[in-house]
Amino acid sequence: MKKLGIIYGFILGVLAINAPEVLPQNTFPSELVNFKEYPGNPIFTGTNVDTWDKQIRERGFILKEGPNYHVWFTGYSPASPTKFLGYATSKDGIHWERFSKETIHPGQWVEDMCVVKSGKTYYMFAEGEGDIAHMLVSKDRVHWQEKGNLDIRKVDGSPIRKGAYGTPTVIQAKGIWHLFYERDDLGIWLATSKDLKTWTNVQDEPVIKMGPDAYDLFAVAMNQVIHYKGLYYGYYHASAFKDWHEWSTNIAVSSDLIHWKKYERNPIIGNNQSSGIVLKDGKGFRLYTMHRKVNLYFSEGASK
């Protein structure tokens, strides 16, 4: 009996470790889910003339440092199949000035990026050719050094299967780097790293799956994860259509970055507005949807 009691206690302990925490009832504050569109949209677009950035696409990424806003974006044109990195700045996060008429990182495919500042270094996680995620680093936001494709391993340490792994989204939590990535937009996986060199899956199944509701039944990909009021919120884009002809912006919440609860009123932004990211703004947030053109939304309490 004593041995059975020990075994039973061990099983309960394992279940407790693996079970998600019970989330409070009001887990989706209004300022994270209720947004009003800025009347001057779009606030940033491709040039629409014959330049390397005639059009923009996928997720760009915005950081605010002091009074200034910085955006990195993906530009492309019919003249080249390669997607290039651009950079622009703003005093108000609405009116933008391109840093250069040329790409700031010529010769390499950089698309769908996430930028994290740690110490004095900027880390960019982006898709390269074939939707393979890679990392670049910078000290000044403009000059970037390539660090190679991300090395992602299964739980057992073996490499993940060959093929695309894109839309890399990274957050630091408790001294650990957490990487969310998708595979053909068919689910969102989570891997962690202590050294930014080798990433290991937390589990080999997606932490966010498609469905069961219609709005994200055919595609999901994480765009940004923030820590707010003790919980983690993930903004992700999704499609309700098998041919992906329309996308939406959605949100989910987690206490541990592994177990996620989707917002029952998703999507929070429809009308084919996707690749959404947020910035704290006064008492609320700004939400930028980045794909094809940048549109801005303000949550209740955000300064205008």
What are these regions (language model features)?
Residues 1-4:
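Positively charged n-region of N-terminal signal peptides that target proteins for export
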Residues 8-16:
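Bacterial N-terminal signal peptides
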Residues 7-8, 36:
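Composition-driven detection of intrinsically disordered, low-complexity segments
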Residues 23-304:
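Carbohydrate-active catalytic/glycan-binding domains of CAZyme proteins
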Residues 6-7, 304:
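Short amphipathic alpha-helical "recognition" segments used for binding
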